[in-house]
Amino acid sequence: MAGPRGALLAWCRRQCEGYRGVEIRDLSSSFRDGLAFCAILHRHRPDLLDFDSLSKDNVFENNRLAFEVAEKELGIPALLDPNDMVSMSVPDCLSIMTYVSQYYNHFCSPGQAGVSPPRKGLAPCSPPSVAPTPVEPEDVAQGEELSSGSLSEQGTGQTPSSTCAACQQHVHLVQRYLADGRLYHRHCFRCRRCSSTLLPGAYENGPEEGTFVCAEHCARLGPGTRSGTRPGPFSQPKQQHQQQLAEDAKDVPGGGPSSSAPAGAEADGPKASPEARPQIPTKPRVPGKLQELASPPAGRPTPAPRKASESTTPAPPTPRPRSSLQQENLVEQAGSSSLVNGRLHELPVPKPRGTPKPSEGTPAPRKDPPWITLVQAEPKKKPAPLPPSSSPGPPSQDSRQVENGGTEEVAQPSPTASLESKPYNPFEEEEEDKEEEAPAAPSLATSPALGHPESTPKSLHPWYGITPTSSPKTKKRPAPRAPSASPLALHASRLSHSEPPSATPSPALSVESLSSESASQTAGAELLEPPAVPKSSSEPAVHAPGTPGNPVSLSTNSSLASSGELVEPRVEQMPQASPGLAPRTRGSSGPQPAKPCSGATPTPLLLVGDRSPVPSPGSSSPQLQVKSSCKENPFNRKPSPAASPATKKATKGSKPVRPPAPGHGFPLIKRKVQADQYIPEEDIHGEMDTIERRLDALEHRGVLLEEKLRGGLNEGREDDMLVDWFKLIHEKHLLVRRESELIYVFKQQNLEQRQADVEYELRCLLNKPEKDWTEEDRAREKVLMQELVTLIEQRNAIINCLDEDRQREEEEDKMLEAMIKKKEFQREAEPEGKKKGKFKTMKMLKLLGNKRDAKSKSPRDKS
């Protein structure tokens, strides 16, 4: 015992050197006035206390200050009671050693700096080695005296601090458990109902005075949730370690007769309540020394500052998956519900109308979510069947088909014709998208694009006015003389400059580009064209034919002459079956997604006017109705059809992005509750029960070993017993560490479950259209967001604590193993060294004798 004790004593002397009134002669009475504790704290953390203001006569205040500062600022639990220090002339040596070892472990153990709260300039300290390297002979002698004399003296002077508040029996060091400033046996601090160990911060006063009921137990039996009753993960480990340190320290002060404490009580000792310091995140520090091992439990209660910092710092970004979900919710609230559904692209979101892009048409079909069915319901393809009425001119019919629903025409006519005609339809994108969305009802819903042209065209049957309208889509139409109307001619010329009317193959590309140009160029004209003929002006090619119905058809026929074949099949196919058109349109939509839906809408109006001024106004109303139906669909992101064609055209010119819905109409994402490393509650409690049984067995062994150490028996084996003592304390510390880790895991899983619930509720709220939100909804959103941030912060705090504890514990374990091996090696090396020394000495004597004999003989031989 002299070795470890001497090393610790030498370290204390170095730390207290230069402080007035502090003289370290031993590890017992020299610490009674409390100045030695304050001196060690002040050397490393001068910011924590004012040593010059302390008085050697004020024993109680000095000890109280040192114990409180060490516990609150450094996380070292107070194993000693200031009242005990005042009442005892010679404090318990083992308790002092255990407590001081925590100071050494905290200030000198590598890796502790990161765990403890920030210190302002720590003085470097040289860790004391178990061997008496820095230890002076005086220290060793004093240590030996203390080992025998002081321990036995302590036994005679038992103090109230070593008495259990529940059973009034003596509490040994291994059994000590401090809770709310009272000392208990671990086995005495149990739930009155379920007899399970009380956890720090998770118990309440029982019906009778001095009894307790575990909140967790109540949660199991009652409706409560475990997570709510569970104490913060930080407090438990700390309190448990404090309990261990307190037990070690108080057993020593309590004194000598460890026999007074019942062994059964020790075995029963469950890891009871902590000190009522639930928020300390740090775990006990394992002693760099063997002695420190006993103290590690005390280190458990690391500085509360960590917890405070964690709570103060918002961690919404941290929960990574959860945080991302939260961001998604915010995005949804902004108006992109696609994030909620997990879909990045929504059919309504793209604004292909303003800008005709071949790629846009294709993406729309992918956006066949629930809203697609609604869009399909729209009778956009119905106009297709109407074309038969436009039979007077097959080319005109074809052009009509192309104009009103170029997508339909493309799908219906021969594959080649359909492809070409689609490009001509700038509205095709929307139509194609919607058609793809609703393949089941192609006839009913020709395509969103068709619906838009219908609304713009005023004729009930887009096919009639479509013939001229097709020109913008089939850029060939612009070629038809623009004899009918000057505005139409202007538009036709605009379209014609970029698109060749005669070329059938090129029209697809030119038509798409022209459709975009025409949409932008005719935006202003379209506003003026809402009347029958002017409407056709929005579609330049269509306008020319629009005024003179027959000439227009002729011009369209001539312009489509090269593609006349395509047009005729289209006319035939269109009247045959609208459903066929829808699928074909889908196929064509792939190549022509670029066509702008918005631009297409005005074009159909012009086509309608072209067909006949009277029908065009009529058609416009049905088309508007169709669009209105689309607007009614919550999933439809397209501009409201109710707006007049002029308004739509104005929007087209600016091509503003359609505002996405706040998130309504999208399926809610199912929350993920379980993690990859999820541990069922049953497994956690089962392992904790096993740990408790092992702790009881260790306590029983510790009581017997403590009695031997205090009784002064086997003085020759004190060092060996001390090594065994530290090993036992370390083993207990490992169990307590694992127990606290399980508590962390349990708390983490509860927080994760709660976070999932909060996120789900938040998503349900965000899924509601923003226009329908009430003040209560907005207030609830703020509450949920704040709770989500708090949950994430708490989870981050737990993760940080676990990481820091693991790192520190690994270093402590390595240090402990090295010290134990060194101590055992010294014990084994001593006898071997003696044997070798004796053997070598005798051998040397013999060798010397032989050499002398040889020398004496040699001269004689020579002579």
Swiss-Prot record:
An example molecular function term from Gene Ontology annotations: small GTPase binding
Protein's UniProt keywords contain Lipid biosynthesis: no
Boundaries of every Calponin-homology (CH) domain copy: 2-108
CDD domains: CH_MICALL1, LIM_Mical_like_1
Polar residues composition bias: residue spans: 325-340
Comp. bias intervals (Acidic residues): 427-438
Motif NPF1: chain residues: 425-427
UniProt keywords, alphabetically: Cell membrane, Cell projection, Coiled coil, Cytoplasm, Cytoskeleton, Endocytosis, Endosome, LIM domain, Membrane, Metal-binding, Phosphoprotein, Protein transport, Transport, Zinc
Chain ranges for the short sequence motif NPF2 as given in the UniProt record: 633-635
Positions of the bMERB domain: 671-818
Subcellular location: Recycling endosome membrane; Late endosome membrane; Cell projection, Cilium membrane; Cytoplasm, Cytoskeleton, Microtubule organizing center, Centrosome, Centriole
Modified residues (Phosphoserine): S295, S309, S391, S470, S471, S484, S486, S578, S621, S740
Pro residues biased stretches: 125-135, 384-395
Region feature (Mediates the interaction with RAB13 and RAB35 and intramolecular interaction with the CH domain): 652-863
GO cellular component: adherens junction; centriole; ciliary membrane; cilium; cytoplasmic side of endosome membrane; late endosome; late endosome membrane; recycling endosome membrane
Membrane topology annotation: Peripheral membrane protein
Location of region: Necessary and sufficient to associate with tubular recycling endosome membranes, mediate phosphatidic acid-binding and membrane tubulation: 700-863
Positions where Phosphothreonine occurs in the chain: T318, T467, T469
GO annotation, biological process: cell migration involved in sprouting angiogenesis; cilium assembly; endocytic recycling; endocytosis; neuron projection development; plasma membrane tubulation; protein localization to cilium; protein localization to endosome
Gene3D superfamilies in the cross-refs: Calponin-like domain (1.10.418.10), Cysteine Rich Protein (2.10.110.10)
Coiled coil: 682-711, 785-830
Domain notes per entry: Probably exists in a closed and an opened conformation due to interaction of the C-terminal RAB-binding domain (RBD), also described as bivalent Mical/EHBP Rab binding (bMERB) domain, with the N-terminal calponin-homology (CH) domain. The conformational change is regulated by RAB13 and may modulate MICALL1 interactions with functional partners.
Assembly, per entry: Homooligomer. Interacts (via NPF1 motif) with EHD1 (via EH domain); the interaction is direct and probably recruits EHD1 to membranes. Interacts with EHD3 (via EH domain). Interacts with RAB35 (GTP-bound form); the interaction is direct and probably recruits MICALL1 to membranes. Interacts with ACAP2; the interaction is indirect through RAB35. Interacts with RAB8A (GTP-bound form); regulates RAB8A association with recycling endosomes. Interacts with RAB13 (GTP-bound form). Interacts with ARF6 (GTP-bound form). Interacts with PACSIN2 (via the SH3 domain). Interacts with DPYSL2.
Function: Lipid-binding protein with higher affinity for phosphatidic acid, a lipid enriched in recycling endosome membranes. On endosome membranes, acts as a downstream effector of Rab proteins recruiting cytosolic proteins to regulate membrane tubulation. Involved in a late step of receptor-mediated endocytosis regulating for instance endocytosed-EGF receptor trafficking. Alternatively, regulates slow endocytic recycling of endocytosed proteins back to the plasma membrane. Also involved in cargo protein delivery to the plasma membrane.
Protein name listed in UniProt: MICAL-like protein 1
Gene name as annotated: MICALL1
